[in-house]
């Protein structure tokens, strides 16, 4: 397994619409394993393949405090959503920035698991929010897209400044 490079906003590759996974094979499972390693190394709770420049419909999530409840979503589809909620969301592709984003309180999805088996899942609370956030990545949408142009511009400037500072220290 290896840690993959996470793309940072405003990288245009984050706007790529992911394509469905045709076959869940050893290569897809290797990508999933690398995505989990990357997500844990970056201290995230979710990661979409788009964020690591792999443009296939793959999401990994672990919202547990113990970091041992891995959820794999291959070709996820939203079946139902209800209620309204929102929290200050962060994103590995938008480091050190947070903003309140409106989301559905509950979702029902269908997807394929790590072995390519279909399943359905009903989720609420943080898991529902995380699923919606990561599924947005698969269609090239970021949490900043829910914000005003002014807030989006400020976040972009902060992220670009952070990236320049990190580049100087390498």
From Swiss-Prot:
Active-site positions on this chain: 134
This protein's record includes keyword Lipoprotein: no
Alphabetized InterPro entries for the sequence: Peptide_deformylase, Peptide_deformylase_sf
Reaction catalysis annotation: N-terminal N-formyl-L-methionyl-[peptide] + H2O = N-terminal L-methionyl-[peptide] + formate
Annotated binding of Fe cation, by residue: 91, 133, 137
Chain coiled-coil ranges: none
Cited Gene3D superfamilies: Peptide deformylase (3.90.45.10)
Cofactor: Fe(2+)
Keywords: Hydrolase, Iron, Metal-binding, Protein biosynthesis
Enzyme Commission code(s) on record: 3.5.1.88
Classification via Pfam families: Pep_deformylase
Cofactor: how bound: Binds 1 Fe(2+) ion.
Record bears the keyword Iron: yes
MF annotations from Gene Ontology: metal ion binding; peptide deformylase activity
Entries under SUPFAM superfamilies matching the protein: Peptide deformylase
BP terms from Gene Ontology: co-translational protein modification; translation
Family: Belongs to the polypeptide deformylase family.
Biological role: Removes the formyl group from the N-terminal Met of newly synthesized proteins. Requires at least a dipeptide for an efficient rate of reaction. N-terminal L-methionine is a prerequisite for activity but the enzyme has broad specificity at other positions.
PANTHER family listed in its UniProt record: PEPTIDE DEFORMYLASE
Identification of the protein by name: Peptide deformylase
Organism: Photorhabdus laumondii subsp. laumondii (strain DSM 15139 / CIP 105565 / TT01) (Photorhabdus luminescens subsp. laumondii)
